Amino acid sequence: MMNVMDTLAANAAQTEQRGRVVETSLKAAKAAGAFALRTPVAHGGSWATATVAVELIAAMARGCPSTAWIASTSLVSKNMISFGDYPAHTLDEVFADPDAVAGGVGIPRGHGESGPNGVRLSGRWASVSGCEDAVWASLGAMVDGAFAIVLIPMADLTIDRTWDVAGMSGTGSHSLVADDVLVPFDRVATGERLHYPPDGRTVQTWGVAVLATAVGATLGALDVVDTMFASNRKPFATSYTRMSESPGARHWLAEATTLVRRAERTMLALASRIDAEPGITDLEHAGMQRDRADAAKDCLAAIERMLDLHGASGFAKSNALQRFWRDVSVVSRHPALNPYLAVEGFGRALTESSPLPRPRA
């Protein structure tokens, strides 16, 4: 994992500036199996456990959070395909390259109607990470009034470059547009051919994959601070000759390290539970969501302490610390890590109230 982390770290600044993962990083990620984590074994993938997936994603995020994020969203997109009873020849086509990047959005932002030769689909799906490097997209849509997951080659879609965000810039999470695209029936799963919504283990796997990027990015920030402590850098306007001479600096470093290591332990514990438990109850689901959100808060708190230690120079655009800070700030606001909804959902589960309202199409 160190090899892929080092390669991604060397290209992280360029990936951010480009708004797209550089080719060298993409090749390294593919070689590490990052985009085959949820490719079926029958098609050359690993269909990895949650533990294996988060360990790899976190290691990648330690070098480049944007590249790691695309690995996590590709996992989700390929996992979505398993919800449909697609013909064998369709799956052979979609998974022809087990290491190909996949993009997708489960929210039904498209509408289609059946015709004699297939479904005519139009729609717009925002925030499709890695779409410029993806080969296939798995997209939620309303087809003939019913929810469906539709598989479409990226070549049949238009990319609207809408992603312009303070952090996670290298993910290239632009919008996909379909304008009266003809989709063969064997690439549309709906009704009895669609097994949806996903089970608790699948939802939790997706959530912990999101957390893995936040944890890995915070560990990457800690690497920057550890390097600073090992250097001749000293606290400004003091008589100390090194950072490590300051009891306050040592205390702040200890707190930052404790926070991120606690988040890492939470991530691994959640992944282990997902792999071990055949089913997840509503109360367990809510508790795991709360734990994810708490771990994300630990990441945010840790990186703030690191910035305190580094001072204003940590915000220099040439300093990797500020990039990790921005990336962690953005990814920790993902719905899977939302703290107030996690608390609300846990409270509902504890009192056996109705679950959180589902989003409307």
Which residues does each predicted region cover?
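Glycine-rich flavin
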Residues: 21-31, 35-134
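Glycine-rich phosphate/cofactor-binding loops in nucleotide/flavin-utilizing enzymes
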Residues: 312-361
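Glycine-rich beta->alpha junctions and the first turn(s) of the following alpha-helix
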Residues: 166-260
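Active-site glycine-rich loop that binds ribose-phosphate moieties when present
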Residues: 103-106, 141, 154-165, 170
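A short core secondary-structure module
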Residues: 127-160
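Glycine-rich phosphate/pyrophosphate-binding beta-alpha loops
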Residues: 126-131, 206, 331-334
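C-terminal helix-coil-helix/basic helical segment that borders enzyme active sites and/or dimer interfaces
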Residues: 9, 13-17, 261-294, 304-315
